[in-house]
Structure formats: structure tokens, C-alpha cells
Amino acid sequence: MLAPIMDSSHSKFRIVILAPKGLRTGGPEAMHQLHHAIMQLGKNSLLVPLPGTRNRISVQQYSKYDPIWGEIWHTRRNDIVIIPESLGQLPLWYFFFISRQNLFLWMLSVDFSYENQFQKYETKNFKIHPAWLKNEQIKLRLKNFKAQKLIMKFFAMAKLQYVKFRNRYMRSRINIDFNNYLFQSAYAREVFRAINDTNSGVMLSDYTNFENKQKIRKPVFCTCTKKHIAYFPAKSLNLISLILDINASRGGLIHFIPIQGLEPSQVIALLSESDLFLDLGYFPGKDRLPREATSLNCPVLLAKRGAARFKEDFPLPSMYLLDLEKLDPESTFEAITKVLSKGKKFNSRAQSKFQEAVCAEKPLFIKEVDNLINLLNNF
């Protein structure tokens, strides 16, 4: 839907959200949720595609948020513009339509921020047990990567020269006032405040949209009698592969099932039927999959990395948070089997606070959005 240009007499300003159109991940969904909440609270809002995504098709699954898409030239200079943390520059001509002082940055993640001090923050500042780094598969991947790197070097250099030219002459770096930062997680808030020695910024989380999931007809995913562990191979596969090797060496007692190439109903079925959801990666923010898992009564076992180090983000008992700085792969596998031995019902009850926190996300988010609107009215 294309937004009409609103008359300034009806509203002092609109809240414009620059979002990647056509991308289905946690960040873009949060932006749609924000847009929807603002509209529900009676304030005008507009989604504007990030540069390079204008011609993409809007994600069909996000139609439930009633998105109103517009163009950058539909904005007014008194509009508030919210951008994601990964956006460090904008085309110069954008600033004919928007004001720099009205830019707000939403830190949906820490480690994927355009700002150098935040990039890969977790991996740079918190190491894992060296045994995780001795994986022969990793060495092979590095070898292959080096070979590919040589082949791609010429093309990369050409692209780099173009990017340098574009950034210098065609784009403008974005500098955000500390007071104009919004934080999706306690992890983002605390890292930002520690690095910048400030108490500035406002919390603006998101929520896990598990409404009506129970009404979806769930296919039977697996009928074997083994314990089932769901995992997301697109994240931390180099670590998970070591666990899979250990499991195979012990006769494959556990059935590890990847969340990969599945329809939404299949993901729901897998998480509903699994005894555990395992994630050994770092959490640049409050990742959705662990929250979706617990909303489907699937216990989680997470690496204590990134946002998982903060109780405010993941209120889990310590036995469900794996300290990979101390635990090697063998010890981690033992911890996994120990958790499984407790049984799904026990683990679910032990994680009741996490489940309650996830259930309370939406009303909390609406309250945060309402608070943000009130702050902006006095901006």
C-alpha cells in the first residue's frame, strides 16, 4: 500500500521507518511491528525501503502488520526517521527530504552495527574454549576460503573502488545523537552505554508473534523414539558440527534436526515436537527462534554469549546457559545429555520465567512504543 501525503494540520510529524523491503528476518519483522503499533496507537507512520530494496516485493507474512509503504520523497523534514543499526550512510539527496537531527537509530543487534566499536563485539571481547577452534572442518573451510579469496580478489578490489567513490561523493555518513538511540535488548543498551560512558537512549524491544500458532494444523515431523534436538544450521554450524560428530561417534543416540528449508507449519511442528532447541552461536540481540521455541513449549539450551549473558533478555536458569569459554565440545555434549535426561516437562517448568517473559513481550512493547511517542511529541 502506498502512503498518501499527510497534511501537516492533521499531525505534527510522522514516524518514518527505513526498513529493508522483501527481507524476512527478525529485524525487518520488528520494524513492521513498530510501524503497526504506532498506527494502532493513533500516530501516523510510514515504511520506506532502504536504498537498494525499493523494487522488492513486500514479505507476504508481514501483511498481518498492515504495512504502508512509501518513498523517501513522501517524507517531510519534520518527520522522525528511524533507521536500523546496520545503516551507516545514506544517499546525499535523501537529506533534501529528511532532517539529520530527526534521525533515530534502533539497535536491533550489536555485532552487526555499522559502527566499528560494536562490530563483532562478542567474538572480539569474549573468547570460547580453544578446543572449539581445532575443528579440522574449520581448517578445511579456511583453506577453501583462501582459495576462493584469491579468485575473487580482482572483483573485490573493483567493487571496493566503486564503494569508496560512492561513499565519498554520493553518500553521507550518518551521525546519531546519543539521546536518539533505541535498544532492542539489554545487551545493546549496556554495551552502548559502557562504550560511550553515557546513560542515554531508550528501550524499544519487539515481540514474538506466536498468536494463532496453536491453531495451525501441525504435520507429524518425526516418529522415531530418540530424543529430538532442533537447531538452526545457518548459525554456528562450525560449532554444532563438532557436537554432531560426537553424537555420531556415540551411536547417534540423539536425533538432531536442522531448521532449514522448512515451511512455517513445519518449523512449528518441529519445535513443538522437539525435546530441546539448541543454539551455540552468539546472540547479537534477542533472537527470535529461542523465544518462538519456548512459546511452543520447547525448552531451550543456549550458549551464554551476547544477549544470552543478560537475564533481562533471556531469563533462564544457569543450567540452560552454556559457558563455551569453559566448556569444550565433549563437556558441552555431556551438558546437553544431562539436560535431556531431566525430561521435557521438567525443563519446560524450569524455564517458566522465560516463557512468562515471552508471553508478556507484546504488551510491554506497546507500552514502550507509547512511551516513545510521548517522548517524540516533546522532541
Identify the residue ranges that each predicted region occupies.
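Extended catalytic core of nucleotide-activated donor transferases of GT-like folds
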Residues: L2-I5, V16, R54-N135, K139, ...
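Short acidic alpha-helix that forms the nucleotide-activated donor recognition element
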Residues: P264-S274, S295
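Catalytic binding pocket for nucleotide-activated donors in carbohydrate/polymer assembly enzymes
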Residues: Y282, R288-C359
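Structural motif
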Residues: L18-G22, L50-P51, I82-G88, L108-S109, ...
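Acidic donor-binding loop of glycosyltransferase active sites
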Residues: S272-G285
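Alpha-helix C-terminal capping/helix-to-coil transition sites in glycosyltransferase folds
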Residues: R76-N78, D177, S272-E273
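Conserved catalytic-core segment of nucleotide-activated headgroup transferases in glycan assembly
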Residues: E29-A30, V163-V267
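N-terminal pre-catalytic "stem/leader" segment of glycosyltransferase-like enzymes
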Residues: M1-I80, L301, A308, Y320-L321, ...
